[in-house]
């Protein structure tokens, strides 16, 4: 029997409301700034009442971008979508096949190869990023979608998660597939892949957001403004030195950048939660 403690309920709800307020208030301020004109957004203190210029600001950045060296924002969104989707598809494909080979194929040093993959989790991004940039430069993949996406497709985390899930599948499945004469890829496509759908959904959401939020990598790889991504592009919209930042346009760009990952999470939230729960069983 669970004891009813009113004070604990009140405390829990109070902390929940405060947490939500702390998270949502900056987003509300950004939304208000996106609805104001240049004069109102620079007023001190800035009003917290939404204005009427939201559509005007969105249209301005959508067509013209922000600043003199900025691409139209629709192009940045397209580049970010291509990058995030390619990284997601590549990570899932490479990680699933790698884990499948490690779990079900018997070849020399397979455990050593797995631990070599796993050890990369212990290396900070800063240790790996500049050698990776040098490799991409030597392969002449700077300022290209291939340079943006290929180095980020390998994932030790995803490989580890798929390996742990595959190890929970009963050996009887493999034996039944062998008796039926199924090839390894037939076994993978007809049995392993359908059983992994909930895990795939969870990993898809996590990986898409990871790819969408990339900042440092596009900043190092891309110099062509037509290949810029939204997250790195927003940083470029902020003026330095004597320049003036159009904060209303920057905040409008930030709101547009939030929409795709939010839509992905809302559409796939049930499958995402189910995938996280199933992976813990």
From Swiss-Prot:
Q: Which CDD domains match?
A: TM_PBP2
Topology class, membrane = Multi-pass membrane protein
Q: Which SUPFAM superfamilies match?
A: MetI-like
- Transmembrane ranges, per UniProt, are 16-36, 85-105, 113-133, 142-162, 202-222, 247-267
Name the coiled-coil region(s): none
Q: Which InterPro entries match?
A: MetI-like (IPR000515), MetI-like_sf (IPR035906)
The superkingdom listed in its UniProt entry is Bacteria
Q: Is Transmembrane helix there in the keyword field?
A: yes
| Any one cellular-component term (Gene Ontology) | plasma membrane
Domain annotation ABC transmembrane type-1: ranges: 77-268
The record's family statement is: Belongs to the binding-protein-dependent transport system permease family. UgpAE subfamily.
Subunit structure as annotated in this protein's UniProt entry: The complex is composed of two ATP-binding proteins (UgpC), two transmembrane proteins (UgpA and UgpE) and a solute-binding protein (UgpB).
Q: Which NCBIfam families match?
A: PRK10973.1 (NF008210)
Descriptive protein name: sn-glycerol-3-phosphate transport system permease protein UgpE
Tell me which species this is from: Shigella flexneri
